[in-house]
Amino acid sequence: MSKENRDTGRAERAAAVRADQARKERNRRIGLVALIVVILGAVVAAGTWYGGGGSADTPSASVAASAGQGSVIAGKAGAPVKVVIYEDFQCPFCRELENSTRDFLRENAAAGKVQVEYRPIDLLQSTYGERAMNAFAAVLAHSTPAAALKLHDLLYDNQPYESDSASVSPSQILGLVKKAGGDNPAVETALKTQDAAFFQAASEVMSQKKITSTPTVLIDGKPVTGGVPDIVKAVENAVG
């Protein structure tokens, strides 16, 4: 098969995945709106309003970070449980998994119970996903693993809707890099062009591992099946 045919096939698969995830995201939003309406109705009926800080601004446990092959790793190599997460920075289900597991995994990684490897891939081929992944690659290569891990988190915290993927500008991405502590002249230079080698390596991993959806999660080398709730349950059961 020619390179042109391979690229065309990959683009078609990415378009199909984007369409499927967009449909699922629309359904999820409809469900969330309905739930919010019910909750607000209950609050009004009770005549009370809860106003307080949530956990979104609470920092995760401090954990040692190291660089992998196209990835950032949280936790020690000797941890009894190994979790690998293949993810796309634009994938809404990856963000859902992040929101559901980040604190749990970091706390247990800090305690030596699990090692977590975050491996970004460009499955959806979206504007935000590619800008985010390129920034991650730049920080991973030219700054510190700790900054790359922090940037990873910030990129999910600031993920736009898929329909608004281009809304986060390169200057805003740079702002996240600075907030993560990963800014330096080499990183800023790297941000000006796409890291073709990093993207190609991620594409090859996708082909080798036959990854067709995100998030794809491996626990001790074995893939976890099901949706995000199933993955969360499997991770929590494995770590204990």
Give the label of every model feature segment.
Residues I85-D88, I211:
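Processing junctions and N-termini across compartments
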Residues A79, E87-F89, R95-Q172:
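Structural alpha/beta surface segment adjacent to cysteine/selenocysteine redox centers
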Residues G68-V72, R102-D103, A202-V205:
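A generic local structural motif
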Residues V83, C91, V217:
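Conserved S/T- and glycine-rich ATP-binding loop of Class I adenylate-forming
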Residues V44-A65:
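C-terminal region of N-terminal signal peptides and the immediate post-cleavage residues
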Residues K3-L32, V37-A45, G51, G175-G240:
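C-terminal cap of thioredoxin/glutaredoxin-like
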Residues A64-V81:
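A short beta-strand-turn-helix
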